[in-house]
């Protein structure tokens, strides 16, 4: 006999037709669009041998694959393992955290290859893709994973897929405006990935505000083993963040510099986070929420300026500041956002991605405005900011102004896009869980028998107590 489901469930969360239909329809659409538009780039095409002769290359080692693929591997692990496991801290939402992150990322990278391809690598009616396109698609999906953190445990998989469709589209537009029209530098995505993703997600979760979410408060916390799983995600993200911030930088000194700056900022951020986590607790004990999240803020904040001459000590300062800002945000700001602004931020993305992303954009603007030929050298100065062609007359101060404008554009795109998507997801047709069933795997997943029994008894205490 099938076990009775949770009492009090007032919403239809039945996914048997909704989820398969949208997944299959969208995958068929991807197959058709890829068939029409997508082709291998020159360095992935079988005509590479002719390309080598034309470019006077003697070895396959000059193929961009061998420069970019190690970084791509690291970024790929961050998206699917790092972000996925970071969100497993919820005691009863481990399947949803990893599984839905897997789902939206797998769909998102396909749509991102198309959207970014139409903007950046569309030639003669075809999108030409190579390993750098794969990295950029992962970056785009990283922004979606950030937004997912704000609504974790409160949405259906169908809502997540719809959000991914819109967010990837808006990300590609925002990225094109910043990188191509404003000509800003944002190698590690402080503005395009973190600022946009965080404030997009926060706007969406504001529209999806649940006044009775207190009914699920008992499941919103963590247990010992769920925090350990989340810490696995933290460590993967922390270790690979230098690759993330340097993955698409120019070969040579820029990529080298980006990795060093990120490395230093992350290290400083850990010590500051530990210090303030202890300082802000009455008994001086460390809070695992801070260690899992705030320790990564240094990587976020150094993203825009990573390939600039920020210097190692400058990176340490950025990491130091972000450790403080992020930890203080978790302690004081997150409760205020929920009680005063009705922003229910499950993972605290405002503290890990939002504020550090803004700091990163500001640091990038200041570093660009302060750049001189004495520091960079004449050729290095031109190369670092790509002051060529129509931008050859641009000065550091003007570049700094455009960098600051990039922050504003990202925020406007995030708020406008989040408002649109939040309004769509608010419609009562997507199978989202009832307030009392949020943060619960059992709504959308088959869970092991003993776990399911625990959930049933938790919602039916009278029967649990009966002999």
From Swiss-Prot:
Xref: InterPro entries: Ammonium/urea_transptr, NH4_transpt_AmtB-like_dom, RhesusRHD
Annotated membrane topology: Multi-pass membrane protein
This protein's UniProt keywords: Ammonia transport, Cell membrane, Glycoprotein, Membrane, Transmembrane, Transmembrane helix, Transport
BP GO annotations: ammonium homeostasis; ammonium transmembrane transport; intracellular monoatomic ion homeostasis; regulation of pH; transepithelial ammonium transport
SUPFAM superfamilies in the cross-refs: Ammonium transporter
GO cellular component, one term: basolateral plasma membrane
Protein family membership: Belongs to the ammonium transporter (TC 2.A.49) family. Rh subfamily.
Name by which UniProt lists this protein: Ammonium transporter Rh type C
Taxonomic classification: Eukaryota, Metazoa, Chordata, Craniata, Vertebrata
Gene from which this protein is expressed: RHCG
